[in-house]
Amino acid sequence: MAENEFVKIRRELHKIPELGFQEVKTQRFLLDYINTLPQERLEVKTWKTGLFVKVHGTNPTKTIGYRADIDGLPITEETNYSFQSQHEGLMHACGHDMHMAIGLGVLTYFAQHEIKDNVLFIFQPAEEGPGGAQPMLQSDIMKEWLPDFIFALHVAPEYPVGSIALKEGLLFANTSELFIDLKGKGGHAAYPHTTNDMVVAACQLVSQLQTIVARNVDPLDSAVITVGKIQGGTVQNIIAERARIEGTIRTLSPESMTRVKERIEAIVKGVEVGYQCETAIDYGCMYHQVYNHHEVTREFMEFAKEQTDVDVIECKEAMTGEDFGYMLKDIPGFMFWLGVQSEYGLHHAKLQPHEGAIDIAISLITKYFEHKGNQ
């Protein structure tokens, strides 16, 4: 294909962002493209709205896995791209369109060129929620085609084009959503003594939650509790019967996640008693930490440093969440950041990753597969 063909593919995918487990058009686009490739060594299996694509090696002794996530976000795009999202209120604001284009680029090469070992491409739905990695990992297809090691990348607006960033060990945090519902007794604003005001209770709860990181988490560990949304009440002269708090929890260790949740539950119970209300906690979508296995990560870093067109940066761990962590929990492998140099960050309505990173990533991964898959 022409050198810029995968930029065109990225732009077509950018037009059709879809939420988790709703990626029907995306799956159809991927299948239609894959069907144009030589089929002699390819085997394709669908899973919900995702795909497994196996490239059969000529004399395989192992299977190498590459995962690309495929879902978009509920964000109204503000890029002014000529290829802006055609789905109102949805956007590829986390670079998954780039991830897919890169995956298709590498897949195209190995559909056309022999490799000794098997290569498994996993196009995974629902990374942004409710989480596709864990159920995909537990699927019969994955059990049948289980790779011996696996890796993935994620675009990074803060790093320049031509760079990748990674480290051995912990890369991304443990993450959990947080939803807290409060129900009290509403009433007229002139008679507060006859009510249990859930706006006041919610405000008290938000303040108390912020003490957890400061006083209940080891200072040498890290945790973040973010309350991003509060809902309560209906109009200005009615005391609110209900309130809802929505946020996230992020910790660098599983032990801290357990401790933080224990403290949240204790504090919520205290608010329930103090404000004579009913409460409910839902942790929603929870992701395991991304932990890069030392040996394979070190080997990849050494390989990448030998490439003249890639700058390898050893980064620090981040409080980002990624359900690829579930795959790395069961399969040796790693994840790395791909520099895409954008003024705006991930999950921003104006994110514009530099498309020059697509060919750089395709080249690096193709060379690495040839290195690993022909040993």
Swiss-Prot record:
Q: Where is the signal peptide?
A: none
Tell me the Gene Ontology biological-process terms attached to this UniProt entry.
diaminopimelate biosynthetic process; lysine biosynthetic process via diaminopimelate
Enzyme Commission number(s) of this protein: 3.5.1.47
**Reactions this protein catalyses:** N-acetyl-(2S,6S)-2,6-diaminopimelate + H2O = (2S,6S)-2,6-diaminopimelate + acetate
Pathway given for this chain reads: Amino-acid biosynthesis; L-lysine biosynthesis via DAP pathway; LL-2,6-diaminopimelate from (S)-tetrahydrodipicolinate (acetylase route): step 3/3
Q: Name the active site residues.
A: D69, E128 (proton acceptor)
Q: Name one Pfam family in it.
A: Peptidase_M20
Q: Which GO terms describe its molecular function?
A: N-acetyldiaminopimelate deacetylase activity
Recite the UniProt keywords alphabetically. Amino-acid biosynthesis, Diaminopimelate biosynthesis, Hydrolase, Lysine biosynthesis
UniProt entry tagged with the keyword Hydrolase: yes
Q: Top enzyme class of this protein?
A: hydrolase
Q: What does this protein do?
A: Catalyzes the conversion of N-acetyl-diaminopimelate to diaminopimelate and acetate.
Q: Which family does it belong to?
A: Belongs to the peptidase M20A family. N-acetyldiaminopimelate deacetylase subfamily.
Q: Which NCBIfam families match?
A: amidohydrolases
Query: What is the protein's name according to its record?
Result: N-acetyldiaminopimelate deacetylase
